[in-house]
């Protein structure tokens, strides 16, 4: 056939080559993604504009519902107004009240740095591991086993007294007829306390320990706590020296608070120990339990 009837002369629409098809699909997908991104940005801008028009007391309540890390790392970068609110005391006082860290109705002027108070309060905990011997000697280092060495015993123990100050304390460490010592070193930065806070605010570091003896033997106790620099230089120290423990079995607390210790503190080294004063084989030396190190708001 010739003319229009010739199959070879009939024109057919061109098909895209395999190489061209993915490019066209990719271009369409990119265009859709761009449209979605622009729509999201527009929604975010509208939301920010809406929040910017809120009265300050209402905006503070909205911001107070957000996680603290988002407030510091993201919200304060939105605009100057938000930065001032995040850096100001009222927002953090409100967060403290909402989370039960301070009573409702606390006055703004009672504390200058509510943001620091908030972060310190959220981190507040005993930084010593295994303070009562529930995990034997786990967490303790530089352990000296004088005489028959340390032993973990159940309260009240032989010729001892119950620990009535805290019902959760069930065990204690008993020392022997020569000095038994053990220590822990706390890395404050690893525990969440940053350099600027430690160097500028210098929050109080509170150390506590409980010790007792037996009713049938005399004993000695000692505690040494040092604040160390990054190079482990001693920047502050508290030491009891050797303390004679009364032979009545009662539990006694010793406490010390480090304040105004200067910049550079990065570690806390806690060391305590005991022995008996009659040199009897066994575990007649001082007993220790419920030791603690706290960074206070």
UniProtKB/Swiss-Prot annotation:
The record marks 159, 177 as: Important for carbohydrate binding. Residues 16-47 have a biased composition (Acidic residues). Changing residue 279 to A: Abolishes binding of glycoprotein targets. Residues 117-297 form the FBA domain. InterPro entries: F-box-assoc_dom, F-box-like_dom_sf, F-box_dom, F-box_only, Galactose-bd-like_sf. Disulfide bonds: none annotated. This is F-box only protein 2. The gene is Fbxo2. Disruption phenotype: No visible phenotype at birth. Mice are viable and fertile, but after two to four months, gradual hearing loss sets in, due to degeneration of epithelial support cells and hair cells of the organ of Corti and spiral ganglion neurodegeneration. Pathway: Protein modification; protein ubiquitination.
């Amino acid at each position: 056939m010739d003319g229009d009837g010739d199959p070879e002369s009939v024109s057919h629409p061109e098909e895209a080559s395999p190489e061209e098809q993915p490019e066209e699909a990719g271009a369409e997908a990119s265009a859709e993604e761009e449209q979605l991104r622009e729509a999201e940005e527009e929604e975010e801008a509208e939301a920010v504009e809406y929040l910017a028009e809120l009265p300050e007391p209402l905006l503070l309540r909205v911001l107070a519902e957000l996680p603290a890390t988002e407030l510091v790392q993201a919200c304060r970068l939105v605009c100057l107004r938000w930065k001032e609110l995040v850096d100001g005391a009222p927002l953090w006082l409100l967060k403290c009240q909402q989370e039960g860290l301070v009573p409702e109705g606390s006055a703004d002027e009672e504390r200058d740095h509510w943001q620091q108070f908030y972060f310190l309060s959220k981190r507040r905990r005993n930084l010593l591991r295994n303070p009562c011997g529930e995990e034997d000697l786990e967490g303790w280092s530089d352990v000296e086993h004088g005489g028959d060495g340390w032993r973990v015993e159940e309260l009240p123990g032989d010729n001892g007294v119950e620990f009535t100050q805290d019902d959760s304390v069930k065990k204690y460490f008993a020392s022997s007829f020569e000095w038994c010592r053990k220590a822990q070193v706390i890395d404050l930065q690893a525990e969440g306390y940053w350099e600027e806070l430690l160097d500028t605010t210098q929050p109080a570091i509170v150390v506590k320990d409980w010790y007792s003896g037996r009713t049938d033997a005399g004993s000695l106790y000692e505690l040494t706590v040092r604040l160390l620099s990054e190079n482990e230089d001693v920047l502050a120290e508290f030491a009891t020296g050797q303390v004679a423990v009364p032979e009545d079995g009662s539990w006694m607390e010793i406490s010390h608070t480090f304040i105004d210790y200067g910049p550079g503190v990065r570690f806390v080294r806690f060391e305590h120990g005991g022995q008996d004063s009659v040199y009897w084989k066994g575990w007649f030396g001082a007993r220790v339990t419920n030791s603690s190190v706290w960074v206070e708001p």
